[in-house]
Amino acid sequence: MLSGTDFVKKIKEGNKELFEASRSNVRRFFASKPSDEYLVEHFRGRMVNEAQNMYAIAGQVASADPSTDVKDLELLSRQAMDEAKHFRMVKEVIEHITGEELDVAAAFAAEAEKPQAKGASLLDKYEASDDEAALAAYQLVAEGRAEAVWNEMATCVEDKFISSRYATIAKDEGFHSNLGGRALSKLVEGSEALQSHVLALVEKMRVDLLEISNQNTATPLAVV
């Protein structure tokens, strides 16, 4: 059985292949020179994904047990605020492209009619609202991949307005991934059974996240 710290290091090492494959998909997508119409579709999906993350993390804070460590609550609350910021920033990117104010409700409705695969959907699939370890694992893996993806997009996108916002979001996603690692390290310390449970979840998450990336970057309408 590994220490909590070494356990998290093991997961991070195992994430490298997923992260590189996701970055490669990003490079291929932007090399295709998608039109503004495609980019708006792309950012609509990203915006809704950030909103879903915001709702999920805020829900975790709202339903936290009174015995929850205050520092953990503070950090989780910061992540919820970051997700809200990302929601706003992607909305601004869409408005930058179209030159018009975005009807957010209409955008959500359009996304519901023609949904793009999203990492946030895994929060429900793995019942993260009821499983602290699943939530921490999601943060570590999915948010770590998001950092890699946003950084790659910041490099690929030529528009400086968009690129600068991508870089900001990437930095936040790295912080969120570290939060997951911090929480997971504490949760699995001294528990071989929980470590086995998390490893099984992480393997499935990696497969799901790669499939999401592959599906979405197979067409110009991509949320990577």
Regions found by a protein language model. Name each.
Residues 1-224:
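Non-heme di-metal
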